[in-house]
């Protein structure tokens, strides 16, 4: 199927465009699909869609190591525009004197929102084998680091939110971290 501009000033069709077989492809990069608008405005253009996997790593904020099992360290992601959704079932293979924050990798760096923009993250995490903290309310909370491709864990007690560290959670072999996170990127 070929679509061509008819006439020197023709810019559109008078009816819907239906593609019954094949894909809609652009001849050059940096093009997008404009939704819900009659003009080509950046705010209404989807120019980035990607699905894929990344190798999740777990590092220690202060010292030591924590290694994930190679059979349980692949995360899946979908990126639509600036919104990223990730999920993974990560399991610990081994640890060696881990200390400090638990830092999990992400496939893309997160945005650093301006004061008038909510660019944060939202996520859930279920763990097996880890130690709940004194007065902990609910599960661990994945907290995406702005301007970086990683997240740390926090927990809440009755009055505040606190960091989860290797030291106070007591991680070991076969501990499991299942997470789903949504966050924004700069582009």
What are the residue ranges of the model-derived segments?
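Short small/polar-residue motifs
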Residues: 14, 67-78, 134-141
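Intrinsic low-complexity, repeat-rich intrinsically disordered segments enriched
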Residues: 1-62, 87, 94-96
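Surface-exposed ligand/attachment interfaces on beta-rich extracellular proteins
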Residues: 37-45, 53-79, 89-114, 161-173
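Terminal beta-strand-rich extracellular "head" domains
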Residues: 90-148
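Substrate-binding and catalytic surfaces of secreted/luminal carbohydrate-active proteins
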Residues: 84
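Generic beta-strand structural signal
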Residues: 19, 28, 79, 144-146
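Short, structured beta-strand segments at or near domain termini in extracellular proteins/domains
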Residues: 173-187
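Structured beta-strand segments within beta-sheet-rich domains
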Residues: 132-173
């Amino acid at each position: 199927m070929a679509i061509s501009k008819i006439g020197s000033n023709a810019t559109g069709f008078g009816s819907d465009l239906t593609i019954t077989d094949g894909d809609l492809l652009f001849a050059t990069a940096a093009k997008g699909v404009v939704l819900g608008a009659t003009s080509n405005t950046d705010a209404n253009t989807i120019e980035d869609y990607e699905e894929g996997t990344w190798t999740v790593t777990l590092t220690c904020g202060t010292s030591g190591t924590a290694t994930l099992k190679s059979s349980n360290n692949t995360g899946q992601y979908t990126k639509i525009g600036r919104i990223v959704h990730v999920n993974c079932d990560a399991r610990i293979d081994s640890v060696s004197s881990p200390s400090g924050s638990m830092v999990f990798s992400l496939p893309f760096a997160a945005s650093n929102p301006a004061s008038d923009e909510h660019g944060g993250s939202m996520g859930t995490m279920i763990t097996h084998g880890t130690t709940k903290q004194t007065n902990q309310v609910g599960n661990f909370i994945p907290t995406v680091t702005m301007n970086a491709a990683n997240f740390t864990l926090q927990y809440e007690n009755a009055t505040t939110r606190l960091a989860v560290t290797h030291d106070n959670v007591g991680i070991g072999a076969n501990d499991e971290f299942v997470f789903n996170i949504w966050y924004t990127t700069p582009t």
